[in-house]
């Protein structure tokens, strides 16, 4: 493979784990990119929006494993030119529990995950439990565990923490996940982590003949203030392609779309537009397939896309998108105990008229339970979602001033 052939990532790998366990530092060690780009995030030292970082994994043809695995063009052991294996995209999801919703909307975009666990703290920490449950719900089964910060504790403590990790993941989807001790800030064992990712998070087989579909994870106006009308560029949407392919010149439909007031009723109308440009990272491409975050330049009025206005929408080939739902019924499963809180609070059943938060793809919306009957709840949404029947949604309840994940449901009608 040459550089040009690997312009677009082929696999999305999420990072999960408790706040301050080193997810963003780990991604930096694997890609040389800090995924905290927003000023508020840098000031508060936390990731609020999903961050994406692309990297090319390489292999030295001379050195033995794991030291042959690298992100460098030249092997640092023997100076041989390295061979390109593949380009992957890391999705950095927020760690704080108040932002669990964003984590869930990000997990919908992951082919595999690195569960980051801080070796200096007892395992599991509350959010580590919550994130593993979230990965389990969304069906991310290909997992590698990175045991971080091994440079600041003794060998005995690392082994003790390793045993805690193995106990924690027993009987979960991460039971057979490899545990790689790593010190990302010094790039110690990064080679072993790349080897584990290559073995345990393969590139998924994708059916590119399916109709194009993409979750919109961000949208913006690229025009500077004061741009002359004749120089204005159309709105840009960014997201991950779930299936199919997209090329310049394609017509796309976006649902639920645009809010329109009709008398007292609020309706949403689908938006139709044309693709005029495609980007992966900073590289312009003619055709895009699943993998990484894709920027799509359109002919939309930039006022429609500014400040993430279209986040939570779904884009696709016209006429192929799922229905827009204002109300739906779900078969729901609630966790036994509240995960992520210091006290393991018991979760009470859903109640009629209770306000809840629903995550579907990249959409986050509030809803009210209108009825419950034999494990099936009917939910009226404040803002509709575009979702297939049998698709999975996450359910959160307001507890102590924040939304906390309490379970999930499958849309049944």
Predicted regions and their residues:
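Residue-level signature of catalytic and energy-coupling elements of molecular machines
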Residues: 20, 26, 45, 92, ...
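C-terminal effector modules of nucleic-acid-centric enzymes and ribosome-associated factors
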Residues: 12-15, 153-155, 167, 302-413
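Conserved catalytic-core segments of large NTP-driven translation/proteostasis enzymes
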Residues: 5, 167-310, 314-321, 326-336
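Conserved Switch II/interswitch segment of TRAFAC-class P-loop GTPases
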Residues: 84-89, 93-100, 107-130, 136-160
């Amino acid at each position: 493979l040459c550089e040009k052939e690997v312009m677009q990532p082929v696999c999305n790998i999420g990072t999960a784990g408790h706040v301050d366990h080193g997810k963003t530092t780990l991604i930096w060690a694997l890609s040389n990119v800090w995924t905290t780009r927003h000023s508020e995030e840098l000031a508060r030292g936390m990731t609020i929006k999903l961050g994406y970082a692309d990297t090319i994994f390489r292999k030295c043809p001379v050195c033995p494993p794991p030291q042959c695995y690298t992100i460098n063009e030249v092997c640092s052991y023997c100076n041989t030119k390295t061979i390109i294996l593949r380009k992957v995209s890391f999705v950095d999801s927020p760690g704080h529990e108040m932002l669990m919703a964003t984590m869930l909307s990000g997990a919908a975009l992951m082919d595999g995950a690195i569960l980051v666990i801080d070796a200096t703290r007892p395992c599991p920490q509350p959010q580590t439990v919550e994130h593993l449950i979230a990965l389990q719900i969304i069906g991310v089964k290909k997992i590698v565990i990175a045991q971080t910060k091994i440079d600041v504790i003794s060998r005995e403590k690392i082994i003790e923490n390793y045993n805690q990790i193995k106990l924690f993941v027993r009987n979960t989807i991460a039971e057979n996940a490899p545990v790689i001790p790593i010190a990302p800030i010094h790039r110690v064992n990064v080679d072993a982590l790349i080897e584990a990712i290559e073995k345990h998070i393969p590139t998924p087989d994708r059916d590119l003949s399916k109709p194009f579909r993409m979750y919109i994870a961000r949208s913006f106006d690229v025009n500077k203030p004061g741009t002359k009308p004749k120089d204005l560029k159309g709105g840009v949407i960014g997201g991950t392609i779930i299936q199919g392919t997209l090329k310049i010149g394609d017509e796309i439909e976006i649902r639920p779309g645009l809010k329109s007031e009709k008398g007292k009723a609020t309706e949403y109308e689908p938006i139709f537009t044309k693709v005029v440009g495609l980007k992966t990272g900073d590289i312009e491409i003619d055709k895009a397939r699943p993998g990484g975050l894709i920027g799509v330049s359109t002919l939309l009025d930039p006022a429609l896309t500014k400040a993430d206005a279209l986040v939570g929408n779904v884009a696709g080939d016209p006429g192929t998108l799922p229905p827009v739902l204002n109300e739906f019924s779900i078969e729901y499963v609630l966790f036994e105990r509240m995960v992520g809180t210091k006290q393991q609070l018991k979760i009470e059943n859903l109640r009629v008229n209770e306000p809840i938060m629903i995550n579907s793809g990249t959409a986050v919306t509030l809803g009210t339970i209108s009825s419950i009957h034999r494990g099936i709840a009917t939910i009226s949404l404040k803002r509709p979602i575009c979702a297939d029947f049998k698709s999975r949604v996450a359910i959160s309840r307001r507890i102590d001033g924040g939304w906390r994940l309490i379970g999930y449901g499958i849309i049944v009608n």
